[in-house]
């Protein structure tokens, strides 16, 4: 690698709100999005909620000259909705589906059927290895009564672990997507603390766009006040996060968002605002010991957020086990009822009534059995994430007590930040 190596990486991210039969003006919005991406000529365009593979193929054909490489990440019954368009050849592709993703009986929310996931693409840019990730986490739906909070924390941890373990050979790491979390939310803090990723909005030298970088704003005609909840001025739930891993320094020169409409018309691309970032990457000479400046103060934030996350997962585990136990009792009660009905059916007097009641009783047992199995699986998934956090927390606490060997993510972050 040349000592004077540098490059600029222009990135586009958007939650497209492309739901067949439900989203408004899909065809027009996809057409305008394709025109805009061709005009701007980004290095990477990472999209979420493209839940129509036909629309992806439309964009792929429309963008083929500007973005010759593209990929659609498939998962679940409906699909992950994730896709990428790249001006540069994609060397490797991998997808990880989150193990916890809501509840199948909350069908009106639909997250469980989508197979929410994270997609990884590896690019080589003049010798530099870039790991780019695109993801979409579980929606919140209600700030006051968030029944999916534990699932979203578990997803954030799973995402952080995935990045942590797959980015060790990368020079630069980029994560874009709809995290469905506010900047100070537990899952967002957990993700940034464990991976060492920087928030482009916080770090940028030049920001232009909506107030406070909000990516859902009231002036967008597709956004209702119900979507914003207790935040009438807007919410920031879409992110561009980045870091340097090896002998590089990366910073966000510019960050722009749309402000309720696309830059070339008075209509929005989506109910979310688009993010457009320019990252500047340059070679940074290696330091003798990039970890010597790291101490207990830097580690304490990670320890604190891990403890809080484990507590929240514990509450989720207790809830999942309660539902599993309740459905278990229902199964026992239903089976007992079936035995009684079979006895009654053997007689002459109540045979017809018993046979009729057997049908809903069998249905009750089957439904309760499905609920039992699902919540047992949910409890195990939350326990797994909690156990992984405990392992990291124990190591970090011991290291803090010794006052040495800071965690790997922070060391890599510090090394990348040294210019």
UniProtKB/Swiss-Prot annotation:
<feature type="site" description="Important for substrate recognition">
    <location>
        <position position="180"/>
    </location>
</feature>
<comment type="function">
    <text>Catalyzes, at least in vitro, the hydrolysis of sphingomyelin to form ceramide and phosphocholine. Also hydrolyzes 1-O-alkyl-2-lyso-sn-glycero-3-phosphocholine (lyso-platelet-activating factor) in vivo. Also acts on 1-acyl-2-lyso-sn-glycero-3-phosphocholine (lyso-PC) and sphingosylphosphocholine.</text>
</comment>
<dbReference type="InterPro" id="IPR038772">
    <property type="entry name" value="Sph/SMPD2-like"/>
</dbReference>
<dbReference type="GO" id="GO:0006685">
    <property type="term" value="P:sphingomyelin catabolic process"/>
</dbReference>
<dbReference type="GO" id="GO:0005886">
    <property type="term" value="C:plasma membrane"/>
</dbReference>
<keyword id="KW-0746">Sphingolipid metabolism</keyword>
<dbReference type="GO" id="GO:0043065">
    <property type="term" value="P:positive regulation of apoptotic process"/>
</dbReference>
<dbReference type="InterPro" id="IPR036691">
    <property type="entry name" value="Endo/exonu/phosph_ase_sf"/>
</dbReference>
<dbReference type="GO" id="GO:0035556">
    <property type="term" value="P:intracellular signal transduction"/>
</dbReference>
<dbReference type="GO" id="GO:0006672">
    <property type="term" value="P:ceramide metabolic process"/>
</dbReference>
<keyword id="KW-0378">Hydrolase</keyword>
<dbReference type="GO" id="GO:0046513">
    <property type="term" value="P:ceramide biosynthetic process"/>
</dbReference>
<dbReference type="Pfam" id="PF03372">
    <property type="entry name" value="Exo_endo_phos"/>
</dbReference>
<comment type="pathway">
    <text>Lipid metabolism; sphingolipid metabolism.</text>
</comment>
<dbReference type="GO" id="GO:0046872">
    <property type="term" value="F:metal ion binding"/>
</dbReference>
<feature type="transmembrane region" description="Helical">
    <location>
        <begin position="326"/>
        <end position="346"/>
    </location>
</feature>
<feature type="active site" description="Proton acceptor">
    <location>
        <position position="272"/>
    </location>
</feature>
<dbReference type="GO" id="GO:0005901">
    <property type="term" value="C:caveola"/>
</dbReference>
<dbReference type="GO" id="GO:0009612">
    <property type="term" value="P:response to mechanical stimulus"/>
</dbReference>
<dbReference type="InterPro" id="IPR005135">
    <property type="entry name" value="Endo/exonuclease/phosphatase"/>
</dbReference>
<dbReference type="GO" id="GO:0004767">
    <property type="term" value="F:sphingomyelin phosphodiesterase activity"/>
</dbReference>
<keyword id="KW-0460">Magnesium</keyword>
<feature type="transmembrane region" description="Helical">
    <location>
        <begin position="354"/>
        <end position="374"/>
    </location>
</feature>
<keyword id="KW-0443">Lipid metabolism</keyword>
<feature type="binding site">
    <location>
        <position position="49"/>
    </location>
    <ligand>
        <name>Mg(2+)</name>
    </ligand>
</feature>
<keyword id="KW-0812">Transmembrane</keyword>
<protein>
    <recommendedName>
        <fullName>Sphingomyelin phosphodiesterase 2</fullName>
        <ecNumber>3.1.4.12</ecNumber>
    </recommendedName>
</protein>
<keyword id="KW-1133">Transmembrane helix</keyword>
<keyword id="KW-0479">Metal-binding</keyword>
<comment type="similarity">
    <text>Belongs to the neutral sphingomyelinase family.</text>
</comment>
<keyword id="KW-1003">Cell membrane</keyword>
<keyword id="KW-0472">Membrane</keyword>
């Amino acid at each position: 690698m040349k000592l004077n190596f540098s490059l600029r990486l222009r990135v586009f991210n958007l939650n497209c709100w492309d739901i067949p039969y439900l989203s408004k003006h899909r065809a027009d919005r996809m057409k305008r999005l394709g025109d805009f991406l061709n005009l701007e000529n980004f290095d990477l365009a990472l999209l979420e909620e493209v839940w129509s593979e036909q629309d992806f193929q439309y964009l792929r054909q429309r963008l083929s000259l500007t973005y010759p490489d593209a990929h659609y990440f498939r998962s679940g019954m409906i699909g992950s909705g994730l896709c990428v368009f790249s001006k540069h050849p994609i060397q490797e592709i991998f997808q990880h589906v989150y193990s916890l993703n809501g509840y199948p009986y909350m069908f009106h929310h639909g997250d469980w059927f989508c197979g929410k996931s994270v997609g990884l693409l590896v690019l080589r840019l003049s010798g530099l290895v870039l790991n780019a990730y695109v993801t979409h986490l579980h929606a919140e739906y209600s700030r006051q009564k968030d029944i999916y909070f534990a699932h979203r924390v578990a997803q954030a941890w799973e995402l952080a672990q995935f990045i942590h373990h797959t980015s060790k050979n990368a020079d630069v790491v980029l994560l874009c997507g709809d995290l469905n979390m506010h900047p100070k939310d537990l899952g967002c803090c957990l993700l940034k603390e464990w991976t060492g990723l920087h928030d482009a909005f916080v770090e940028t030298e030049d920001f232009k766009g909506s107030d406070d970088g909000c990516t859902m704003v009231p002036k967008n005609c597709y956004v209702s006040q119900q979507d914003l909840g207790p935040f009438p001025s807007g919410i920031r739930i879409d992110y561009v996060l980045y870091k340097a891993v090896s002998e590089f320094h990366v910073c966000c020169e510019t960050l722009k968002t749309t402000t309720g409409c696309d830059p070339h018309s008075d209509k929005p691309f989506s109910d979310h605002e688009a993010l457009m970032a320019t990252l500047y990457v340059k070679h940074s000479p290696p330091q003798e010991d990039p970890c010597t400046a790291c101490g207990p103060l830097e580690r304490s934030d990670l320890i604190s957020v891990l403890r809080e996350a484990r507590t929240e997962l514990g509450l989720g585990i207790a809830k999942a086990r309660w539902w599993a136990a309740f459905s278990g009792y229902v199964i026992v009660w239903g089976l007992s009822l079936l035995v009684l009905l079979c006895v009654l059916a053997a007689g002459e007097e109540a045979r017809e009534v018993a046979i009729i009641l057997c049908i809903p009783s069998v249905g009750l047992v089957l439904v309760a059995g499905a609920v039992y199995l699902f919540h047992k699986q949910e409890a195990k998934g939350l326990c797994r994430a909690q156990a992984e956090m405990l392992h990291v927390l124990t190591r970090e606490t011991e290291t803090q007590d010794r006052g040495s060997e800071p965690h790997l993510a922070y060391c890599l972050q510090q090394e990348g930040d040294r210019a």
